[in-house]
Design a protein with these regions (language model features):
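N-terminal interaction/assembly modules
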Residues: 1-117, 121-131
């Protein structure tokens, strides 16, 4: 599995968690793997663990860089993608920030809209400059 594929699998879990916030990441992974819906490798597991453990800090950083939006009004796809990317940017040192941003934009193009991709690129670009 490539890192891009691992990010997509992690995105799916984070997106699901938005709708099932009473479940842990581990519970969502277990249920989805039992159904054969996802495969989580070590890289994806690390992204997810960091995203869950640091969700408040990640959301604060995202909120500080939103232009014209409140975090609770963001499309859920965009929120999950940004949480994933910021988790990677902050806590996975061996991945260049530009790679995290680019893959987030690609996820937005696949699962969201062109407008989502553009907005996510802008927000993550602002976050990258602040790091």
């Amino acid at each position: 599995m490539t890192r891009s594929e691992a990010r997509e699998q992690a995105f799916i879990v984070l997106f699901e968690r938005i709708f099932n916030s009473d479940l842990t990441i581990a519970e969502i992974i277990d249920a989805a793997q039992e159904e054969g819906l996802i495969k989580i490798n070590g890289f994806a597991a690390s992204l997810l663990q960091n995203a869950q453990e640091n969700e408040d800090a990640i959301d604060k950083l995202i909120s500080e860089n939103l232009k014209g939006w409140a975090i609770n009004r963001l499309p859920k796809v965009s929120l999950a993608i940004m949480r994933l990317a910021v988790s990677e940017m902050l806590y996975i040192e061996e991945v260049p920030v530009g790679v995290s941003v680019n893959d987030a934009v690609e996820l937005a193009k696949k699962f969201g809209t062109a407008d989502d991709a553009t907005y996510i690129n802008g927000v993550l670009g602002a976050i990258a400059k602040s790091l």
